[in-house]
Amino acid sequence: MYLFSEYDTFWIYLSISSLIPILAFSISRSLAPISKGAEKATSYESGIEPMGDTWIQFRIRYYMFALVFVVFDVETVFLYPWAMSFDILGLFTFIEAFIFVIILIVGLVYAWRKGALEWS
């Protein structure tokens, strides 16, 4: 009887999860019709042909909100395992997590005072 070594399951999972997207893209590429032409290069907006120049630049104001969200989302990723093993890790880990949260709060206050969270 063959027993899996410690990493055999990992390598099987990795190879299957790599093979599935490769197969999906290969099948799509071989079966999908390829049509190149001027029609592919035109912009399409709700079935209406654009009038005038269609390239405009505009300021994206959501990036700072997204950046602050990502910071606090990463904070959650770090704090969740700590909270689940709080009783095992002890006081030193609590102090480390507390300092981590304080640094993030200082960063939030800094972003708030700089106007990063203002819409205008």
From Swiss-Prot:
The chain crosses the membrane at residues 7-27, 64-84, 88-108. Keywords: Chloroplast, Membrane, NAD, NADP, Plastid, Plastoquinone, Quinone, Thylakoid, Translocase, Transmembrane, Transmembrane helix, Transport. The keyword Iron-sulfur does not apply. It is a multi-pass membrane protein. It catalyses: a plastoquinone + NADH + (n+1) H(+)(in) = a plastoquinol + NAD(+) + n H(+)(out); a plastoquinone + NADPH + (n+1) H(+)(in) = a plastoquinol + NADP(+) + n H(+)(out). GO terms for molecular function: NADH dehydrogenase (ubiquinone) activity; quinone binding. The keyword Transport applies. Its EC number is 7.1.1.-. It is found in: Plastid, Chloroplast thylakoid membrane. GO terms for biological process: photosynthesis, light reaction. One of its GO terms (cellular component) is chloroplast thylakoid membrane. NDH is composed of at least 16 different subunits, 5 of which are encoded in the nucleus. NDH shuttles electrons from NAD(P)H:plastoquinone, via FMN and iron-sulfur (Fe-S) centers, to quinones in the photosynthetic chain and possibly in a chloroplast respiratory chain. The immediate electron acceptor for the enzyme in this species is believed to be plastoquinone. Couples the redox reaction to proton translocation, and thus conserves the redox energy in a proton gradient. HAMAP family: NDH1_NuoA (MF_01394). This is NAD(P)H-quinone oxidoreductase subunit 3, chloroplastic. It comes from Cryptomeria japonica (Japanese cedar).
